[in-house]
UniProtKB/Swiss-Prot annotation:
Phylogenetic placement of the source organism: Bacteria, Pseudomonadati, Pseudomonadota, Gammaproteobacteria, Enterobacterales
Organism in which the protein naturally occurs: Escherichia coli
Binding-site residues for a beta-lactam, renumbered to this chain: K76, S133, E169, S240
Entry function: Extended-spectrum beta-lactamase (ESBL) which confers resistance to penicillins, as well as first, second and third-generation cephalosporins. Has cefotaxime-hydrolyzing activity. Inactive against cephalosporin antibiotic, cefoxitin, and the carbapenem, imipenem.
A matching Pfam family: Beta-lactamase2
Activity modulation notes: Inhibited by the beta-lactamase-blocking agents clavulanic acid and tazobactam; in the DH10B strain.
Family annotation (InterPro entries): Beta-lactam/transpept-like, Beta-lactam_cat, Beta-lactam_class-A, Beta-lactam_class-A_AS
Gene Ontology BP annotations: beta-lactam antibiotic catabolic process; response to antibiotic
NCBIfam families: bla_class_A, blaCTX-M
Keywords: Antibiotic resistance, Hydrolase, Plasmid, Secreted, Signal
Protein name per UniProt: Beta-lactamase CTX-M-25
EC numbers for this chain: 3.5.2.6
Gene Ontology MF term list: beta-lactamase activity
Main location: secreted
One GO CC annotation: extracellular region
Gene: bla
Amino acid sequence: MMRKSVRRAMLMTTACVSLLLASVPLCAQANDVQQKLAALEKSSGGRLGVALINTADNTQTLYRADERFAMCSTSKVMAVAAVLKQSETQKGLLSQRVEIKPSDLINYNPIAEKHVNGTMTFGELSAAALQYSDNTAMNKLIAHLGGPDKVTAFARTIGDDTFRLDRTEPTLNTAIPGDPRDTTTPLAMAQALRNLTLGNALGDTQRAQLVMWLKGNTTGAASIQAGLPTSWVVGDKTGSGGYGTTNDIAVIWPEGRAPLVLVTYFTQSEPKAESRRDVLAAAARIVTDGY
């Protein structure tokens, strides 16, 4: 209990560091956000991790942001980004075709299953992985890159020393408590997502393509997006796995303001616990209130 209290106090302090030159009411507001996230976590019965970066002034709102969580399908962003990076020097890569065999299909293949005994381009595989969370598409991208460790290696090249991908679909979604495989921290993922979509980790064309794919996601309406004003533009990637693990990572464009980058990770203690997208929506609502 004391360890949890100390951790929360540290996180509250972190939230206020960026407000050192601001007024006491602003720091009190940051503490209020921490208290609301703690209350949400307690009522949910799980473990919640949140990292919000306001790109207007680089302030951060953090909750368990340095703890590891299973990424599940949010890892697809890094795999797709690695392929996009290759396409900067391998012209025509996204148009190259890959055979889709019946044996390639696994547990969730909404797009790939339509192309069995046919082919898909790397561009189509990337879109399927990001916008429909197609697991066969993800495995094809990982195989092309040379294995999960190559995705991790790419993360290192963009300054992310925390991300680790150890397995392929669907086993990367086991999300066993305490298992470091296929995990990252909310803050590390938020920083990586910012670098990929708003920074210089990718070339202009590749960055624009990644953002377009994320904005076209079909799986996120009930997660982060559900906690935001309808006028805000969202590009996101969801993920889910064992132990009721429910994730969403997003770049958010509030109307008339600088983008926000938000990562929400949530997991539970029971292996067959239900997903809780409502928790992610509530967390998004809490941390963006007042923007």
